[in-house]
Amino acid sequence: MTKNIGKITQIISAVVDVKFTNNGELPEILNALECYNDKQRIVLEVAQHIGDDTVRCIAMDSTEGLVRGVEVMDTGSPICIPVGTETLGRIMNVVGEPIDGKGDIKSSNISAIYKSAPDFTNQSTERNILVTGIKVVDLLAPYIKGGKIGLFGGAGVGKTVLIMELINNVAKAHGGYTVFAGVGERTREGNDLYHEMIDSGVIDLEKPENSKVALVYGQMNAPPGARARVALSGLTIAESFRDMNGGQDVLFFVDNIFRFTQAGSEVSALLGRIPSAVGYQPTLATDMGELQERITSTKHGSITSVQAIYVPADDLTDPAPATSFAHLDATTVLSRQIAEFGIYPAVDPLDSNSQVLDPMIVGEEHYSVARQVQQVLQTYKSLQDIIAILGMDELSEEDKLTVSRARKIQRFLSQPFHVAEVFTGSEGKFVNLADTIAGFKGLVEGKYDDLPEAAFYMVGTIDEAIEKAKILK
């Protein structure tokens, strides 16, 4: 078979035009092309056909130093990456090249990053709770095993810390495999996560086959093409783990889905497409749907996905986060107002929700306590204007009691994290679901009305709050 060779005719940032004149055959849309820039392999992905002999491509690596006239070869298939157990304990980039300095990834299994979602008949509809050990999440917006979970928040409210704590609490206790896709986030955070996983034993450097996690990075400094595709590369590895050996349960962490959308917007502008609302690509809903529909559970294995989603200017109606909402089973909304009070995790207990907060799934007691907690907090929120204008003295005795309980609940929703121990100096806490329900049930029923507010701040179980109250007295 003769190789289909073309030549670069134009380079504009991450967009490269390639002319094929040999036999008139143009590479298919989404095919991967290869060229070399100073002995470094660069992968280009076909995005458009221009005329009879030219294709417009998106570069997956920096185009600095690339010149017109360089030969480009059509690989005949989309971007393919190594999958399977050989990827465990390794860090790779969007095209499957190792970036951890540990040599090539010797995998006999290679898979294209574009696939169809499993058939409807093969998808699972089971709903089981995934206990995270984080009180506010487990009580008010519980996660689903095999579901899609979104962590929404503006800049600096704690999305990455929360995702790291979830990796710590869920991935370490989880028997199966974990895949982490770093999409357009800080290289330092990726490095911290890698070394933390080595320290905790999730990655075994001496025997990589004993590792439990594979990492795929396309960080902030990567070209838009890489950032737009790295989530698909990570998902391809997660799918391979899900389908191997008759089915596995896989955890798939993505930080950050907004950067995936942002990169798609950059690529779209470079390709000359007319932007839609707020400058996003006209294909925003399609791009999001193609990624999210593949993150699903089958009758044999599951993918539980936790996705951090940056909210520009704290506006949840922005098209990027708004497009994500429809695909998610549970949403955890992080609030700047709550972070300003020093309550961490800064999860908004009234904005966050979950499809499984249903008495048929979580049980009558859990559902009842969660709704009572939200009712107390909602009443307190509606009284805040009166308190601000007239003060606490003008409230009825019943309202004063509600405010007192709400403030205790707010503080009891805080929790010291394992991954933040070095910053807070407090030992991290994992709280079992039964302890969480029992603690909040006592609070809404008034069992702890005599304890000071400060006793409930940054503790795990209600017993710890009682002990703290004794010390404070």
Curated annotation (Swiss-Prot):
Which reactions are catalysed by this chain?
ATP + H2O + 4 H(+)(in) = ADP + phosphate + 5 H(+)(out)
Keywords assigned = ATP synthesis, ATP-binding, Cell inner membrane, Cell membrane, CF(1), Hydrogen ion transport, Ion transport, Membrane, Nucleotide-binding, Translocase, Transport
What are its E.C. numbers?
7.1.2.2
Q: Where is the signal peptide?
A: none
Extract the GO molecular function terms from the UniProt entry: ATP binding; ATP hydrolysis activity; proton-transporting ATP synthase activity, rotational mechanism
Q: Which Pfam families does the record cross-reference, listed alphabetically?
A: ATP-synt_ab, ATP-synt_ab_N, ATP-synt_VA_C
Superkingdom, natural source: Bacteria
Locate the residues binding ATP.
G153, G154, A155, G156, V157, G158, K159, T160
Q: Where in the cell is it found?
A: Cell inner membrane
The record's GO CC annotations read: plasma membrane; proton-transporting ATP synthase complex
Q: How does it sit in the membrane?
A: Peripheral membrane protein
Major location category of this protein: membrane
Q: Which InterPro entries match?
A: AAA+_ATPase, ATP-synt_VA_C, ATP_synth_F1_bsu, ATPase_a/bsu_AS, ATPase_alpha/beta_chains, ATPase_F1/V1/A1_a/bsu_N, ATPase_F1/V1/A1_a/bsu_N_sf, ATPase_F1/V1/A1_a/bsu_nucl-bd
How does this protein assemble?
A: F-type ATPases have 2 components, CF(1) - the catalytic core - and CF(0) - the membrane proton channel. CF(1) has five subunits: alpha(3), beta(3), gamma(1), delta(1), epsilon(1). CF(0) has three main subunits: a(1), b(2) and c(9-12). The alpha and beta chains form an alternating ring which encloses part of the gamma chain. CF(1) is attached to CF(0) by a central stalk formed by the gamma and epsilon chains, while a peripheral stalk is formed by the delta and b chains.
Q: Please state which protein family the record places this protein in.
A: Belongs to the ATPase alpha/beta chains family.
Its biological purpose is as follows:
Produces ATP from ADP in the presence of a proton gradient across the membrane. The catalytic sites are hosted primarily by the beta subunits.
Q: What is this protein called?
A: ATP synthase subunit beta
Task: Report the source organism.
Answer: Rickettsia akari (strain Hartford)
The lineage, from the top, is: Bacteria, Pseudomonadati, Pseudomonadota, Alphaproteobacteria, Rickettsiales
